[in-house]
Amino acid sequence: MNFHEELADRTAWTENVVKTFLPEESGTQKAIMEAMNYSVMAGGKRLRPLLMHETYRMFGGTGRVILPLMAAIEMVHTYSLVHDDLPAMDNDQYRRGKLTTHAKYGHAMGVLAGDGLLNYAFETAMTAFDCGEDPERVAKALRIIGRKAGIYGMIGGQVVDVQSTGRAIDQEELDFIYELKTGALLEASMMVGAVLAGASDEEVEAVEKIASDVGLAFQIRDDILDVTSTLETLGKPINSDDRNEKTTYVTIHGLEQASKDVEEISELSLIHI
């Protein structure tokens, strides 16, 4: 099995893990479950839960305690996309080739679906305490997700991103946005995998640095695709950054240099191994 086949196989397995933890669509309030499940199952690379599991395996983890955390991190990521697509933010109608949650279910349900996913993510993550593993590791993992998803992580980056709309920003501020908005959840994913497997503090710190570099390279690549891809290929509107008057690596450095930056940052991440 080559790399691409192995990746496809593990991604499919990860997809099934996430799916098993989604809420049952029943009860008087089942409309919110439908919107939540639609949001999660509308496609995606499942990069964060996949990285979490692979890091867990790398440090010798073999138990099932990782599974609810894998589902939880994907729910947190999805809620952020649902809210990012709202009219008050990027106002996108398509993501992953399908209607965004608010475009399909309405603005109010888009807000509530995102809220529901964030809350249900932690409800799901808490079930890791029932897996018979070290509760201190589980508690540490939950703290990591909470901080990296919150005002000192993803939300903090989103705030500065919103404030920067319509004005030019410098490289330092752009890197701050990218590290928090994109990098923080990737850091959380890999750190949680390491923590649950019993990695040392030094190893967890190294993993965090690697994930930070990966997150920056990932976001720059997304900047490039926003101006070079198509709606059909990318699954979401192109030129969204330009439409929303956002500064990106492409607007600062141009396409050629941005592509070189992706390669350089990716190589830089290897020094932490």
Predicted region positions:
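Long, acidic, intrinsically disordered low-complexity segments
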Residues: M1-V17
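Conserved small/polar residues in nucleotide/adenosyl-binding loops
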Residues: I271-I273
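Mg2+-dependent prenyl diphosphate-binding active-site environment of isoprenoid biosynthetic enzymes
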Residues: D9, W13, L22, S26-S269
